[in-house]
Amino acid sequence: KVDKRLAEQGISRLEIGREAFIEECYKWREEYGTTIVNQIKGMGCSCDYSDEHFTLEPAYVRAVRKLFTDWYHEDIIYRGKRIVNWCPHCTTAIADDEAEYVDEAGHLWYLRYPLTEPVCGLEYLVVATTRPETMLGDTGVAVNPKDERFGHLVGKTVKLPLVDREIPIFADWHVDMEFGTGCVKMTPAHDPNDFEVGLRHNLEVIRVIADDGHINENGGPYNGMDRYECRKAIVKDLEEQGYLCLLYTSPSPRDKRQSR
């Protein structure tokens, strides 16, 4: 709620700094805290309302930090890289219940990925994506182990369009051979399913989108572009170079905390 309030003012938590952001959180608590407690009471929750605490109170914060530190040193928890819902406006993670799917003007692009060396007359595979800009971070193409159409290609490689990087073709049960073309581009850094598949096959993780939604240094000539501008540029380049096949409309997730 505080992030949304700041966004309505055209600012972000990063611009005002940690201390100022916490002050805004306290203001929000002063404004809505009583209402929230009354709602909890209205639901019949049996609590000791004489001993209320705010999660940003210094003592509370210290206790949480100590607990997590202790758990880390006791190997109860660990810190690792995982895919999460992310808002580039707030530059914060988004809970699953704060992400919603809206049917807007999104597309599903079908792209040609040329084989490094033609096999039995086949020169390319066709993959589909709703986010062409993520192809800059592709590190593999997966097929179903039982798919006879592509079994002879497992172990071969394709050349990633625009990037000219060789990436492997491999088999994984995650692929539904009845859906789409039966070939799935793998971008472990930008898709939760791809990330899990990547762990199983030791795929390289190449992140191409920064926290603020712009393409990073791994994006080559697209470095610094907003992801949507990059999408347009990549689609244009793919079409001009003969790699674009088809496109369809598809829904996309959006952070419902953001009104823009």
Regions found by a protein language model. Give the residues of each.
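N-terminal Rossmann-like or analogous alpha/beta NTP/dinucleotide-binding catalytic cores
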Residues: K1-T69, H73, V197, G224-G242
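NTP-handling and nucleic-acid-processing catalytic cores
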Residues: G42, S46-C47, H53, E57-D212, ...
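Acidic/polar loop patches that form or flank catalytic/metal-binding clefts of enzymes
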Residues: Y78-K81, Y243-L247
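Short acidic beta-strand-loop surface patches of small beta-rich interaction domains
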Residues: H214-N218
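Conserved small/polar residues in nucleotide/adenosyl-binding loops
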Residues: Y248-D255
